[in-house]
């Protein structure tokens, strides 16, 4: 992992823990300070943000720099790349689509993309794309696939490595196609649907796929092994698989929403709840 990916991964993982009790705010801050120092030193992380929920109250802690060159500190407004935590939003969109009757997880991919008829991937159920059990799709869409036409040609010609539903293999190409089809079922572009419908329904005003120009100053850099400032590379199905950017405040709210701690509209709350159903 380069540092931008590691920073997003570690930050997001820490978001998922909920502290149930603390003797005092000072004790809590000291515990978080210690953890932040440990992680930042061990992994050479330039900046981090923590969100913790105790008895329904959110606590935020910020460390280091979002931009080393400009010396911009991490704050509640800092926008981080979430990496593969983005997949939870793709799943939310799919669950929302199913609740609205435009998609069924037991449908096959070719129902939504007729071009894929009579191909292994076309005959694959959406639930298998969602659970990485579609027969061994690779981690990434190949680099030489540059547009939607080439993307569909790639899927049309792809051959399974092992039988569908026999193994799970983590794959951006699998969950990415799942997200793509979910938006297609609602006759919408994935990015547009996510930014105009799903994220507003979740009450996450500072979460984006495309960071707006007036928010770019808040957009944190990652740093590679050479110390160069970098951001996520664009690619096919990047929005669906790893393209979400968000703040600690929004992500702590998302965590609370998944635990049923904040009021949401019925459909979006049900979509979140459905995401936690196990498929075996």
Q: Model-flagged regions — what are they?
A:
Residues 90:
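Active/ligand-binding-proximal structured segments within catalytic/core domains
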Residues 5-16:
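Bacterial N-terminal signal peptides
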Residues 104-119, 201-202:
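Short, glycine/proline-biased beta-turn/loop segments that scaffold the active-site neighborhood
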